[in-house]
Amino acid sequence: MYKQIFLCLIIAALCATIMAEASALADADDDDDKRYVRGMASKAGAIAGKIAKVALKALGRRDS
């Protein structure tokens, strides 16, 4: 149980870090750069979510 909680906290921290870095990078003057960085952030968030789902499923199967 503690492993799952710890894993969720790590994933949440990584997602928050990724999103914070992406918004900091989006402060450039070009609108194209902003769109590109925001696109990268949404893709990174989607990938992190998929990884979290797979990890939680793997932990659930292992505990059973």
Swiss-Prot record:
**Keyword Secreted recorded:** yes
The places in or outside the cell where this protein is found are: Secreted
Q: Where would you say this protein principally sits, based on its record?
A: secreted
- Transmembrane intervals: none
A single GO BP term for this record reads: defense response to bacterium
List-wise, which residues carry Leucine amide? 59
Signal sequence residues: 1-20
Q: Name one GO cellular component term.
A: extracellular region
Tissue localization of expression is:
Expressed by the skin glands. Synthesized in the stomach and stored in a novel granular multinucleated cell in the gastric mucosa. Stored as active, processed peptides in large granules within the granular gland secretions of the skin.
Domain of life of the organism encoding this protein: Eukaryota
What keywords is this UniProt entry annotated with?
Answer: Amidation, Amphibian defense peptide, Antibiotic, Antimicrobial, Cleavage on pair of basic residues, Cytolysis, Fungicide, Hemolysis, Secreted, Signal
Which residues form the propeptide in this entry?
Answer: 21-35, 60-64
Question: Which family is annotated?
Answer: Belongs to the gastrin/cholecystokinin family. Magainin subfamily.
What does the UniProt function comment say about this protein?
A: PGLa and PGLa-H display a broad-spectrum of antibacterial activity against a range of Gram-positive and Gram-negative bacteria. PGLa also displays antifungal activity against C.albicans ATCC 14053. PGLa-H shows moderate antibacterial activity against the multidrug-resistant methicillin-resistant S.aureus (MRSA) but exhibits very little hemolytic activity.
Protein known as: PYLa/PGLa B
Upper taxonomic classification of the species? Eukaryota, Metazoa, Chordata, Craniata, Vertebrata
